[in-house]
């Protein structure tokens, strides 16, 4: 009985020592005491346990990670400030976000330091604005997707039928084939221009290209794109003129010969 009571007493003492050791380590961590004092306490506790273990039954040894006190005190010299370099790169980057500015609008000094990015950013804004305006204006004028293939198919076969008729008529009536072919082609393209006048292409690509070019060339392209509708109208008028001349040549063949 004495042996059992002695073993129980030793176990209680070991538990109390462990509890004291855990409380001391937590206090040292909070107060930031030196690691030398904590290491001496750990050694003293280990020596006391070694003395008690001589008279007690063998106990499984505890791991060294539990016995050795970790130094959890904060040391500013050992901290690696890796994010500082990333923060510096973020500060010098033109894509950084300004949380204190409304709607995260880039500051003006970013455009002064990066002129290439300024041109690219302005081109993106202009192209997005033109694309939204074009979609808004032509929203009610776009052809449905179901009827678009049918429209292209009709134009294709109408063009083929007209050219076939011209070739047959010129062959049997001994008419010059080349002028009449050009006349019919001009007529067909004129009708296509008249029907598709409201579905013109977008000029956002030319605007983006003009923003990336040097000032003289960019201004020239922007100035030229403003006259694209007039060029389209001139081409349409030229096609209609050729068609009228073809009709005159048909009724008055003496104009050709």
UniProtKB/Swiss-Prot annotation:
<feature type="modified residue" description="Phosphoserine">
    <location>
        <position position="35"/>
    </location>
</feature>
<dbReference type="GO" id="GO:0032977">
    <property type="term" value="F:membrane insertase activity"/>
</dbReference>
<dbReference type="GO" id="GO:0071816">
    <property type="term" value="P:tail-anchored membrane protein insertion into ER membrane"/>
</dbReference>
<feature type="transmembrane region" description="Helical">
    <location>
        <begin position="231"/>
        <end position="251"/>
    </location>
</feature>
<dbReference type="GO" id="GO:0006890">
    <property type="term" value="P:retrograde vesicle-mediated transport, Golgi to endoplasmic reticulum"/>
</dbReference>
<keyword id="KW-1133">Transmembrane helix</keyword>
<dbReference type="GO" id="GO:0043529">
    <property type="term" value="C:GET complex"/>
</dbReference>
<dbReference type="InterPro" id="IPR028143">
    <property type="entry name" value="Get2/sif1"/>
</dbReference>
<feature type="modified residue" description="Phosphoserine">
    <location>
        <position position="132"/>
    </location>
</feature>
<keyword id="KW-0812">Transmembrane</keyword>
<feature type="compositionally biased region" description="Polar residues">
    <location>
        <begin position="54"/>
        <end position="63"/>
    </location>
</feature>
<feature type="transmembrane region" description="Helical">
    <location>
        <begin position="160"/>
        <end position="180"/>
    </location>
</feature>
<keyword id="KW-0597">Phosphoprotein</keyword>
<keyword id="KW-0472">Membrane</keyword>
<dbReference type="GO" id="GO:0016020">
    <property type="term" value="C:membrane"/>
</dbReference>
<dbReference type="GO" id="GO:0005783">
    <property type="term" value="C:endoplasmic reticulum"/>
</dbReference>
<feature type="region of interest" description="Disordered">
    <location>
        <begin position="16"/>
        <end position="68"/>
    </location>
</feature>
<protein>
    <recommendedName>
        <fullName>Sad1-interacting factor 1</fullName>
    </recommendedName>
</protein>
<feature type="compositionally biased region" description="Polar residues">
    <location>
        <begin position="26"/>
        <end position="37"/>
    </location>
</feature>
<dbReference type="Pfam" id="PF08690">
    <property type="entry name" value="GET2"/>
</dbReference>
<feature type="modified residue" description="Phosphothreonine">
    <location>
        <position position="134"/>
    </location>
</feature>
<comment type="subunit">
    <text>Interacts with kms1 and sad1.</text>
</comment>
């Amino acid at each position: 009985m004495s042996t059992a009571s002695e073993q129980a007493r030793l176990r209680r003492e070991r538990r109390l020592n462990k509890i004291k050791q855990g409380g001391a380590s937590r206090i040292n961590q909070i107060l930031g005491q030196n690691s030398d004092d904590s290491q001496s306490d750990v050694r003293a506790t280990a020596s006391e346990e070694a003395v008690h273990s001589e008279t007690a039954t063998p106990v499984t040894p505890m791991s060294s990670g539990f016995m050795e006190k970790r130094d959890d005190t904060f040391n500013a010299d050992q901290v690696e400030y890796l994010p500082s370099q990333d923060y510096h790169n973020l500060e010098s980057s033109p894509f950084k976000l300004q949380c204190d500015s409304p709607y995260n609008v880039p500051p003006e000094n970013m455009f002064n330091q990066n002129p290439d990015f300024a041109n690219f950013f302005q081109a993106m804004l202009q192209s997005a604005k033109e694309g939204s305006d074009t979609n808004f204006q032509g929203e009610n004028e776009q052809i449905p997707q179901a009827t678009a293939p049918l429209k292209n198919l009709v134009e294709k076969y109408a063009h083929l039928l007209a050219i076939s008729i011209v070739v047959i008529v010129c062959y049997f009536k001994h008419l010059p084939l080349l002028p009449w072919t050009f006349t019919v082609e001009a007529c067909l393209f004129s009708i296509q221009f008249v029907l598709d006048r409201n579905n013109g292409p977008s000029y956002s690509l030319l605007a983006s290209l003009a923003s990336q070019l040097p000032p003289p060339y960019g201004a020239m392209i922007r100035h030229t794109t403003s006259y694209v509708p007039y060029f389209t109208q001139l081409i349409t008028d030229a096609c209609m003129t050729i068609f009228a001349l073809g009709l005159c040549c048909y009724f008055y063949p003496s104009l050709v010969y």
